[in-house]
Amino acid sequence: MKLVAILGGGPAGAFAAERLASAGLRTVLLDEKLAWEKPCGGGLTYKAYDKYPFLLDNDTPKRLVRLTRLAASGAGAAGMRLRQPMVIYSRYELNRMLLQRAERAGAQIEQARVLSLDRAGGRWRLTTKHGALEADFCIVATGARNPLRGVGTKLTAADTMLALGYYVPQEQDHVDIQFLPNLEGYIWVFPRRGHLSVGICGRGEPARQLRTRLEAYMQEKGISWRNATFYSHVLPSLAKPAWSRNRVAGQGWLAVGDAAGLVDPITGEGLYYAIRSGDLASQVVLSEAHPPEEKPHAYRTLLNRDFAADLEFGSALAGRLFRDRCLFASVPQRMVQFMRESPRFNGVVQDLFAGTQGYVGLKARLLRNLHGTLLEIVMNFLFSRLVPGET
């Protein structure tokens, strides 16, 4: 293999470029914008920087946040001090760091939009406004709004959620997560360096309705959007049936990140899965164990074993988590209440935040802890009314 073209310079494409170039493979990355401020909270959990320590140990501006507050309408709020902090970047700074790492590794970085992609004779021909390029293999990292129809996942309206929000010139020291009635999604407030990212993501509601919900919350919390910068973006959020037909690979190409639909269908988190899929794709490209015609199958298998099967399982939970009821209240309401009353349950949520608790094993863990959790809730309920000074 002489040359790999990477179509897109976000976290997935940039990290794949670094891995391939570091291994000595000639790598060209093409992206119209390169580093830019993509609409996103910008948070990386322990799972990401434990796997890739450079995401924490670097000189790029970032915030480390340990305090998180989850709230649900009608249930109040529950605070949580994270055992492992969340690392929050502006997406411009994160993308710039990853692209610089790729360039230092030897990747050729080109600011250009790919206008067409054609395959003939086992090779690819790419055209940009600057000319044409031939490549032996392509990694598709073009994001959720992939303009190249022959490669990458095929998203339908049912397989997306909308995210919108504001960059607000204010400061706070904690993350806020707010669940709202009848919304398959949530509001977030992420503190960044010099500003807040305040946003909402949701499935099945128009942008105007989501924006109204968000601005009502901001007004209630005293967060002004008058001098803030508005943003919006479409996120992949594959429904359960879409996973079996998700198009992540084909002859001569592998898709990564949003272009492969690899986003958590419950939280909307995509950064870790972008970086991880870029890593896995580069492993498959470099592997001599798989001839070119076997690389698509090898990549699908690797994705499923690593995290895609867990995301697929999560897609079946998403609607139930946000809209179902538990003990005469919504699931988010009970979750917030249990967090306040049960250290065991709080520990489960801690691990979900850190990314160390997957969806596949969640039910079994909850059942194992059920007796202790209920006992803690009952004892806290009783003794809060018996111990002087507690309410």
Task: Describe every region a protein language model picked out.
Residues 286-391:
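C-terminal helical "tail/cap" subdomain of flavin- and related membrane-associated enzymes
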Residues 5, 18-40:
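Glycine-rich FAD pyrophosphate-binding loop
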Residues 12, 35, 145:
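Conserved Rossmann-like nucleotide-cofactor binding loop
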Residues 9, 101-229, 242-245, 261:
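Predominantly flavin-linked oxidoreductase catalytic cores and closely associated redox partners
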Residues 44-97:
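A conserved beta-strand/loop capping segment in the N-terminal third of enzymes
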Residues 116, 206-285, 289-297:
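FAD/FMN-dependent oxidoreductases across multiple families
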Residues 1-12:
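Beta1/beta-strand and adjacent pyrophosphate-binding region of the FAD-binding site
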Residues 2, 25, 137:
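Nucleotide donor/acceptor-binding cores
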